[in-house]
A protein has these predicted regions:
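Catalytic machinery of carbohydrate-active enzymes
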Residues: 1-188
């Protein structure tokens, strides 16, 4: 065994960056900021063996998208049902296939005040570029996130929110959003 502990893992500074040309393009596309911007990822790859545990149905979290924020879907593909629901939410923007690759996603993440996501590659991307990340985990999360604790040894600006065993996603997401609201209000 390596004898690795939390204290021996270097707490990394951002080690990836978004391309400046993409940052400029997305900044213009987003326009003037009037509220805190929150990127949102609720679903991972549906072919992942644990997707049923780590992804959440959009209609479960939609009622909790507070008007205090401008929400931005960082999802690439979404269902027709989700698209119809998104169209009804004024403070949520979905770019869809305009997000062509991870360099686009990185630029968008960097322009957010926070990124709220389930356990997907976007959580790692946002963490690696130094974003404020709120990671939502089910109670049987991947081992890299450890069994307890609210900090990540891999990303210094990541806050881990752990769903209790048997807890529904709706009250859990509501709790996460309220915690984000408190943080953002204190930053005003």
């Amino acid at each position: 065994a390596f004898g690795t502990t939390f204290d021996s893992i270097p707490y990394p500074r951002p080690y990836l960056s978004a391309e400046s040309v993409r940052l400029i393009w997305w900044r213009e596309r987003l326009g003037r900021k009037t509220k805190p911007r929150v990127g949102l990822v609720w679903q991972g790859n549906s072919n992942h063996s644990k997707d049923q545990y780590r992804s959440v149905k959009f209609d479960t979290i939609a009622p909790h998208l507070l008007p205090d924020f401008d929400w931005y879907s960082l999802q690439f593909d979404i269902s027709e049902q989700d698209e119809k629901l998104i169209d009804q939410i004024r403070n949520l923007t979905h770019f869809g296939k305009t997000i062509g690759d991870f360099s686009e996603t990185a630029a968008l993440c960097k322009l957010m005040d926070r990124v709220v996501c389930v356990d997907t590659s976007i959580a790692h991307l946002a963490g690696a570029i130094g974003c404020n990340v709120d990671l939502m985990l089910c109670n049987s999360a991947d081992a890299r996130w450890h069994a307890s604790g609210d900090k990540s040894p891999w990303y210094s600006r990541m806050q881990i929110h752990r769903k209790n065993r048997g807890e529904d996603w709706s009250p859990f997401f509501k709790r996460v959003v309220e915690s984000i609201r408190q943080i953002e209000l204190s930053n005003l």
